[in-house]
């Protein structure tokens, strides 16, 4: 099977890269082994929330105008900080065409409310997520009886510590008893599959309407809206106050919705999605990937002109940790890491951890190295890359998006895709 590009990994970076390639008329396939890390995410994306010295960033593009703001190995530096604004704008446009209703802009971070009632900088967030300022609001944080993946009292306590008037309430929704009887089934995704049915919408409205009479905003767990946010908009038009949704413990409804919307658009544009498959072997000829062999296709190789590695970090098994060191799982590419295991971590759990910056080494076109030499038709994108700490710097989503579109640009220029 011949393709212009095969992407290994179906997470945020892989899909965004595939979307741009298929828009440019290239034949593209994504080999996806399992669930994307988006299924475990808040549905918000960050671009740059802090600098290495710990100082907060309010205006990411302005901060990136200083070429020394980030270390030389950071993916933003490899891509070129002068390209970030253009690629961020392109990301926002691309996401909008896929269906997600997101708010925010790369020029200015907003502060989103987290499930614990704290504030965290973000670039893009679903429109139903509450953002600062909220000091003047009387907030009621609403839980669902028996639902353990969202703790309303913890969120309310954090809000009160910030000087916000916050109370809690709980709704019953007896119709959910069929799920409530089994704690392992009483999860946000299963609740959403029930509540997203149009005939169930009034049940939720009837439970929330009395609470909406006595406050300025209701915060409740994001346990509906798997396909879109039509139910949230329907409720917002009818309740007596604003309604906002907070992500729950995984699996996350906003994250799954974002992934599904991007996946549907990729397939609609002619992309091939190989679900539940895994690249088991890679054939290299003179420093060029000539064939990929996957679990499901047996002795039928995929023969791409270009390959994109978007296999993720440790969480997605794109990087593997052993006693001997860190290795990249598919090709054994060169990896940035500290030689001594004692230097992998800080004893303070909440301090920036060195291992977060481990990952594949690339040149400034995002071509990775194998035994010190670049692989000519291979690109690495997203969280498999080394040189950045997505937690401490608040840049995980941005690195995925920016590197995905940048690699797609390199491929289009070389492959002759429509510009």
Curated annotation (Swiss-Prot):
Query: What cofactor requirement does the entry state?
Result: FMN
Task: Enumerate the UniProt keywords alphabetically.
Answer: Flavoprotein, FMN, Oxidoreductase
MF terms from GO for this chain are: glycerol-3-phosphate dehydrogenase (quinone) activity
Entry GO terms, CC: glycerol-3-phosphate dehydrogenase (FAD) complex
Please give the SUPFAM superfamilies that the UniProt record associates with this protein: FAD/NAD(P)-binding domain
Give the top-level enzyme category. oxidoreductase
Q: In which pathway does it act?
A: Polyol metabolism; glycerol degradation via glycerol kinase pathway; glycerone phosphate from sn-glycerol 3-phosphate (anaerobic route): step 1/1
Regions crossing the membrane: none
Q: Which reaction does it catalyse?
A: a quinone + sn-glycerol 3-phosphate = dihydroxyacetone phosphate + a quinol
Q: Name one GO biological process term.
A: glycerol catabolic process
Pfam family for this entry, one:
FAD_binding_2
User: At the top level of its lineage, which domain of life is listed?
Assistant: Bacteria
Does the keyword section mention Oxidoreductase?
yes
Among its keywords, does the record have Flavoprotein? yes
- What InterPro entries has UniProt attached to this entry? FAD-dep_OxRdtase_2_FAD-bd, FAD/NAD-bd_sf, G3P_DH_GlpB_su
Q: What is its EC number?
A: 1.1.5.3
Family, per the entry?
Belongs to the anaerobic G-3-P dehydrogenase subunit B family.
Assembly and partners?
Answer: Composed of a catalytic GlpA/B dimer and of membrane bound GlpC.
Describe the task this protein carries out.
Answer: Conversion of glycerol 3-phosphate to dihydroxyacetone. Uses fumarate or nitrate as electron acceptor.
Name-wise, this protein is: Anaerobic glycerol-3-phosphate dehydrogenase subunit B
Q: Which organism is it from?
A: Enterobacter sp. (strain 638)
Taxonomic path: Bacteria, Pseudomonadati, Pseudomonadota, Gammaproteobacteria, Enterobacterales
Its gene name is glpB
């Amino acid at each position: 099977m011949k393709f212009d590009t095969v992407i290994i990994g179906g997470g945020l970076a892989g899909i965004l890269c595939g979307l741009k390639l298929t828009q440019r008329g290239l034949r593209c396939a994504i080999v996806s082994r399992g669930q994307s890390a988006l299924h475990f995410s808040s549905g918000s994306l960050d671009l740059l929330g802090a600098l290495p010295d710990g100082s907060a960033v309010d205006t990411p593009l302005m901060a990136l105008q200083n070429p020394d703001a980030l270390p030389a190995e950071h993916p933003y530096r490899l891509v070129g900080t002068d390209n970030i604004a253009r690629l961020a704008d392109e990301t926002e446009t691309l996401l909008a065409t896929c269906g997600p209703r997101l708010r925010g802009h790369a020029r200015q971070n907003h502060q989103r409310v987290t499930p614990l009632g704290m504030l965290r900088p973000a670039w893009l967030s679903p429109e139903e997520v509450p953002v600062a300022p909220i000091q003047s609001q009387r907030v009621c944080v609403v839980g669902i009886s028996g639902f353990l993946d969202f703790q309303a009292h913890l969120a309310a306590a954090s809000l009160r510590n910030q000087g916000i008037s916050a109370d809690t309430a709980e709704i019953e929704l007896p119709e959910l008893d069929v799920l409530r009887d089994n704690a392992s089934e009483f999860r946000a995704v299963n609740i959403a599959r029930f509540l997203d049915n149009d005939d169930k919408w009034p049940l939720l409205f009837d439970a929330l309407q009395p609470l909406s009479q006595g406050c300025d905003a209701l915060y409740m767990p994001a346990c509906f809206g798997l396909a879109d946010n039509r139910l949230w908009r329907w409720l917002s038009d009818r309740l007596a106050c604003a309604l906002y949704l907070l992500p729950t413990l995984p699996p996350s409804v906003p994250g799954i919705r974002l992934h599904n919307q991007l996946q549907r658009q990729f397939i609609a544009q002619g992309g091939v999605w190989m679900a539940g498959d895994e690249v088991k072997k890679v054939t290299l000829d003179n420093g060029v990937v000539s064939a990929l062999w996957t679990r499901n296709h047996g002795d039928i190789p995929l023969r791409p002109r270009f390959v994109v590695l978007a296999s993720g970090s440790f969480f997605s098994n794109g990087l593997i940790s052993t006693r001997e060191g860190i290795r990249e799982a598919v090709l054994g590419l060169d990896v940035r890491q500290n030689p001594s295991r004692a230097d992998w971590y800080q004893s303070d759990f909440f301090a920036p951890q060195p291992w977060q910056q481990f990952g594949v080494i690339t040149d400034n076109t995002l071509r990775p190295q194998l035994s010190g030499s670049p692989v000519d038709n291979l690109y690495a994108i997203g969280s498999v890359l080394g040189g950045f700490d997505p937690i401490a710097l608040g840049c995980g989503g941005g690195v995925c998006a920016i590197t995905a579109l940048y690699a797609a640009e390199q491929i289009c220029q070389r492959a002759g895709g429509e510009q």
